[in-house]
Amino acid sequence: MKSALSVILGVAAVAFVAAPFTAFAGGSISGKVTFAGKSEQKEFSFAKFPNPKFCVKNPNKALMDGDKRFFKTIEVAKDGGLKGAVVAVVDVEDKAFTDAYAGTDVVAEFCEFLPFTGVVVNNKSFKVENHDADADDPKSVQGVLHNPHSFVVKGSSSATGFNIGLAKKGDKLDKPVVFRGGAEKEGFYRLQCDQHEFMQGFYLPVTNGYFAVAKEDGSFEIKGVPAGKHKVVAWHPFAAKGKKVEFDVDVTEGGTSTLKAEIK
């Protein structure tokens, strides 16, 4: 009897080991952000700003035409996909994520702030590094002067976060993002160079790591979202006048939920 029992337990153990084991860590949200409107841009003249002969060297030639520098506020693909929209789960507060967040990194490169859109975390670092120097200009050999100026924006009001000049290539700043009065829920963070007005960036505050920035065709994917029903927003600083559009998404363990996020 003892021998038979041992055999049964042995077979069960082998079966357990052989059985496939799948460990899920939430699900995914993927889809596309679309915009009902058209692409829009503002136009500047390089000649009206410092370093015109350097700024025109930006390798992204879609940003310029001769002396004209375009600030592309809204970029829409042929099928309506909206580039640069931020998609974020907003009903999860992940203290482990916010505590460990290393900060938002932005670079000034060929007179352009990159990335154009992204996220920030309240009371965490916002970093800007100057990558620009002009070997053809004796005054700018060591660096092209950029003056990153940040704003906390809530509705029609805005307040300065920092205003610091970065004179040399390699110069950096590291300042905390500070939202007050509910701006962390309703507002966003804006960056502009006081030397070159066409250098701007826009960043949505988040409280968890479940976010994505839409690609050129508007597509996005957010992985590892906890299973359950969630509130998800799609936001773009200029489309729909910067208003967040909210969606309900049901995420299943190990599954992928599709979201068609239209901004009108």
Cite the ranges covered by each PLM segment.
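Bacterial N-terminal signal peptides that target proteins for export
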Residues: 1-11
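Short stretches within intrinsically disordered, low-complexity N-terminal or propeptide regions
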Residues: 6, 14-15, 263
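Extracytoplasmic copper-binding redox domains, predominantly the cupredoxin/blue-copper superfamily
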Residues: 23-264
